[in-house]
């Protein structure tokens, strides 16, 4: 009896010592705390949304279909997938959402990846300016580029709205597929996320070991083979991370499809949420399933990726591709023009719109009459002049100032919280790479 009791006591002491040792390291405490918090904040909303898909909501379509005011039913699933409106409420928005996400990934990775390659691996001119200005679209909200697209290409004849710059100045009316729908939405989102691809892929290009490429050059390996067999596999993690984040963000994007007239799962969710609450929750579940699937594929791909190791030290110089005497200037000029329209022109366009007496009234550009411009949207200090349809101008409007203060407060708080949590989790994970918690 004494021996068995002694063994149990010794085992308890060992367990307690292990627990004490585990919690003596701050990274373990951080992992445990954030593991619990993140699990709860991730699982709880999913459970709530799944429950909402079966729940009967008073005054909505599921209550009408079941004849009940409360309880649970599968009527939402049956109606969404099999009713006459299934094509309008589910299949068309789903197809548009997937196509939008795919095209956004292609545009952002091709544009951002090519830009990263030119900046980091060639003798291109104006690199500092281009690398700085290229980030602007990612800093600006999504809807800014969408509104600029409207301001430039919309026309009363095609979209039924006020004329944009092209229609007002040159009487050019772009086709409807150019102004509204999948094409402009994919282009705008692709341009918005291209800087993100540039940051990730460019970081890999800057820090990658050039020894393998140098070895391929010494062995007289063709350039295309070096690119596809060495360079691309080394930037594969950055490309996959870009696909994951861009695809998920594009799937859930609401402002751009809303402004550019594309029906997606996110826009359909907003329109259905009042009368088709349960069915709208099913749309949210579908979007989450896509996100989880992309995440799993990314994890599987990263686990199976090849590791490249050299027996020497890291090369001190990354080989640069010579674009030629003319090419390095010509490509730089082309990129400067492109970045002007994606980064600087949106700011100028918004500034110009604030001085127009009416939306789409660009008459001062061909009359050169500055009196056609107005500052009423900024400086009107009373409600009678109709500066903001019965409200004072921006600088005298208390609602605008309260909104500005609220926006800044939310932005600062989110930055501090996200930065702190991200730093703590990054520290803990880097210290426990082999841990299951990490």
What do these predicted regions represent?
Residues 70, 74-77, 133, 162-166, ...:
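Amphipathic alpha-helical segments in well-structured domains
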Residues 73, 201-214, 223, 235, ...:
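Transmembrane helix boundary and interhelical loop/hinge segments in multi-pass membrane proteins
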Residues 62-66, 154, 251-275, 314, ...:
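Glycine-rich helix-loop "coupling/hinge" segments at transmembrane-helix boundaries
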Residues 219-220, 233:
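Glycine/proline-centered hinge or cleavage motifs at structural transition points of membrane proteins
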Residues 1-33, 125, 300-337:
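Transmembrane alpha-helical segments of polytopic membrane transport and secretion proteins
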């Amino acid at each position: 009896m004494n021996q068995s009791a002694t063994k149990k006591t010794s085992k308890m002491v060992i367990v307690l010592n292990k627990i004490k040792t585990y919690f003596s390291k701050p990274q373990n405490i951080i992992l445990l705390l954030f593991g619990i918090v993140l699990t709860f904040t991730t699982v709880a909303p999913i459970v709530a949304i799944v429950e909402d898909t079966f729940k009967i909501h008073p005054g909505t379509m599921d209550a009408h279909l079941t004849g009940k005011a409360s309880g649970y039913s599968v009527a939402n699933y049956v109606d969404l997938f099999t009713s006459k409106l299934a094509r309008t409420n589910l299949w068309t928005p789903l197809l548009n959402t997937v196509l939008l996400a795919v095209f956004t990934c292609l545009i952002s990775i091709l544009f951002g990846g090519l830009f990263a390659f030119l900046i980091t691996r060639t003798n291109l001119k104006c690199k500092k300016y281009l690398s700085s200005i290229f980030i602007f679209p990612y800093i600006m909200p999504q809807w800014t580029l969408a509104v600029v697209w409207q301001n430039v290409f919309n026309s009363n004849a095609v979209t039924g709205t006020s004329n944009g710059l092209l229609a007002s100045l040159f009487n050019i009316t772009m086709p409807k597929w150019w102004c509204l729908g999948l094409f402009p939405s994919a282009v705008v989102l692709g341009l918005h996320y291209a800087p993100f691809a540039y940051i990730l892929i460019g970081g890999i290009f800057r820090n990658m070991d050039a020894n393998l490429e140098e070895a391929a050059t010494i062995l007289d390996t063709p350039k295309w083979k070096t690119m596809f067999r060495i360079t691309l596999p080394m930037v594969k993690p950055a490309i996959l991370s870009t696909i994951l984040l861009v695809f998920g963000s594009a799937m859930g994007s609401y402002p751009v499809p809303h402004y550019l007239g594309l029906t997606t799962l996110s826009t359909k969710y907003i329109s259905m949420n009042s009368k088709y609450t349960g069915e709208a929750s099913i749309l949210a579940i579908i979007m989450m399933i896509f996100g989880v699937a992309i995440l799993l594929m990314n994890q599987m791909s990263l686990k199976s990726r090849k590791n490249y190791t050299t027996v020497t030290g890291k090369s001190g110089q990354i080989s640069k591709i010579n674009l030629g005497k003319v090419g390095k200037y010509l490509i730089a000029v082309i990129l400067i023009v492109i970045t002007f329209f994606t980064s600087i022109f949106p700011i100028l366009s918004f500034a110009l719109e604030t001085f127009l007496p009416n939306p789409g009234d660009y008459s001062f550009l061909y009359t050169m009459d500055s009196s056609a411009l107005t500052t009423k949207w900024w400086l009107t200090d009373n409600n009678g002049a109709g500066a903001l349809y019965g409200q004072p101008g921006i600088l005298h409007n208390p609602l605008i100032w309260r909104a500005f203060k609220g926006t800044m407060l939310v932005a600062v708080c989110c930055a501090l919280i996200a930065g702190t949590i991200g730093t703590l989790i990054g520290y803990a994970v880097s210290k426990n790479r082999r841990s299951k918690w990490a």
